């Protein structure tokens, strides 16, 4: 087999990155657009709690993929990937005209269209990792780096789009008679939510087109559609050299440095027991951090930020979402292998999380409300909290890599179960019992 040309390799890396861009762009886009839509939908400040539960329920898509593999063994990942991409494109395209439509449910108005389409997109995104990655397993390992780079773009690009859009502005005009606040004056964003969702749809169409391009670019690979073993790039080609380098870089993640040199040790029951305790601790850490970042804290983000204004909420959501891929890139260069270090970072993240939870409990009158210092503190706390927890999750997952596929599977289960438990725990206090309080525009509940 002839060595692929440099142009062929570059194009393949580009298409793989664009494929990764579409993996979580839909759900990330919904999250960063919350500061814009929350003021229009009937759930109000409780909308993030509803969305947390909806995204957690998206893991039901994994059952569908499992059923597909049982009923159609050996069919590969082409059809599931195309179904995921169609659901993502159609879901975001329908969000553009329908996101603001409401309907009565149990005697109360709810944003049925928004939440239903969010569930469809969550099903697609949660299924993407278990369909996209097996497809890429038929390509040489260097292409995985391009895929994860694309996954980072799936968070960064919606954030950039949201920053360009802005969040609008609210002014309270004084009434001429008694000097009290009059009706609020709303200044809109640079473009509406519908335009944002159309732009998000364009990103997903680009990702879907990239997958079709990969199928056309690699027509000689039967493994692309059949699920068989894929061919390797020829030795001596740029891709093969990069693959060897990739394997060398991945080696520290697979075994401790103390065992890298010397003979391979035989089975040791005590070492196995130690690894089990070590692995169980890492899995517990993954479950706790996922419960906090994917369930508990997002459910109260609006209550902790909106008392300081729409801009504070907007910046906390957008910059917090951007902190996630940045932490992942940091972990690729500097990986903490110490359990004590991971515990210390987790405690630091919990400290920020506790501060944010206190702000939410004290809503609508948290400390420093109405001051610039309050805005800076709440935004910085959200960014640092999510950045620290994201780094801990990546580091813990990397340390579990040495356990092979069973360990990574257990890590995925821990992350999803933690997210589901966190979202389910916070839904009753935020959306049913209304433990956290919101406030109306241009009404000061914190005055004397």
Swiss-Prot record:
Glycans are attached at residue 178. PANTHER family: SOLUTE CARRIER FAMILY 52 (PTHR12929), SOLUTE CARRIER FAMILY 52, RIBOFLAVIN TRANSPORTER, MEMBER 1 (PTHR12929:SF20). It is found in: Cell membrane. Keywords: Cell membrane, Glycoprotein, Host cell receptor for virus entry, Membrane, Receptor, Transmembrane, Transmembrane helix, Transport. GO terms for biological process: riboflavin transport. This is Solute carrier family 52, riboflavin transporter, member 2. InterPro entries: Riboflavin_transptr (IPR009357). Residues 228-267 are annotated as: Disordered. Its main location: membrane. It comes from Papio hamadryas. Signal peptide: none annotated. Pfam families: SLC52_ribofla_tr. Plasma membrane transporter mediating the uptake by cells of the water soluble vitamin B2/riboflavin that plays a key role in biochemical oxidation-reduction reactions of the carbohydrate, lipid, and amino acid metabolism. May also act as a receptor for 4-hydroxybutyrate. (Microbial infection) In case of infection by retroviruses, acts as a cell receptor to retroviral envelopes similar to the porcine endogenous retrovirus (PERV-A). Riboflavin transport is Na(+)-independent but moderately pH-sensitive. Activity is strongly inhibited by riboflavin analogs, such as lumiflavin. Weakly inhibited by flavin adenine dinucleotide (FAD) and flavin mononucleotide (FMN). GO terms for molecular function: 4-hydroxybutyrate receptor activity; riboflavin transmembrane transporter activity; virus receptor activity. GO terms for cellular component: plasma membrane. The gene is SLC52A2. Belongs to the riboflavin transporter family. The chain crosses the membrane at residues 14-34, 47-67, 79-99, 105-125, 147-167, 198-218, 280-300, 315-335, 342-362, 369-389, 407-427. Residues 240-250 have a biased composition (Acidic residues). It is a multi-pass membrane protein. It catalyses: riboflavin(in) = riboflavin(out). Coiled coil: none annotated.
